[in-house]
């Protein structure tokens, strides 16, 4: 038998404990709260603050750019700084920025404040995701996270349309405040390398963790552009805005199906081929809207998008964490998502500004998914003869 890294009682993984695990789950929901509710928040910025379609895409990009930078900084600092201190820093920035958003409503100031709020969310969320990635079974941990994510997304999309703009900002503040007493539960040490119950030589090369990070960036260009514009595109196509918002909210429940399907597939099949097939379906789901935006196609696209998004996330996030147990790559995941979500809405705003319309936006979405498909296809053919964790 080869030298296996088998956990011993003296090497108990503190990130497997119930308290830190549940706190990390909740923190990811808080940190991603802007991301999951973008359709409703963008609608509020348009309806309540009078921002244009171009401006809301840029405000969303600013928020998610902050998320990216905060997560990148955390990925470098997490080995030398206390995870608890990084979390407190994220909470402070987010509370201050969201509080100031209630006082300043002009476009330029909102653009800056959303960046600062996103920066705080980046520190906060990166710690949470890295803590889940440090779990001894990271794919299962991320599956539970995404299951909770689906519930949170549905509830937010039901709640936020009924809030004033200030109410939305105060809601975000409250979610950070309630975690303050529990930050002390975050482990201050790194996970033991022995927490992974697979032989060292069977682990995927760390380089693949960073290739996976790049693939997440590309995949989230699709998610950012699609999720920021789908409700606005439905209204532009002549569909009733309230009906479209309800379709989006209820289709989020299909994320549950994505989670449970991912759990079942993990037990029955390998990692790569289901992911490749899922990306093929994603290209079709988002690309159809560029050619035929009817009510039926809209419902089909939103339903498929929500099912496939979560399914893809389970594999992407779990794969990165399995490939790199140090936590640096896992801490970078929110940054990768934030970067993709920054590029997506910003590129969409440029397309709309130049008169390419929402058709061009959905072509962008399809191309981004196709590029991610190509990356994972190359990984598959490169690594298919290697043992997979």
Segments (PLM) and residue ranges:
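Extracytoplasmic gate region of multi-pass secondary transporters
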Residues: 39, 207-249
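Helix-to-loop junctions at the C-terminal end of transmembrane segments
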Residues: 70-83, 258-271, 352-353
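A late C-terminal transmembrane helix in Major Facilitator Superfamily
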Residues: 323-357, 365
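Intracellular juxtamembrane helix-capping segments at the cytosolic ends
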Residues: 122-136, 310-324
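Helix-loop-helix hairpin linking two adjacent transmembrane segments in secondary transporters
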Residues: 135, 141-188
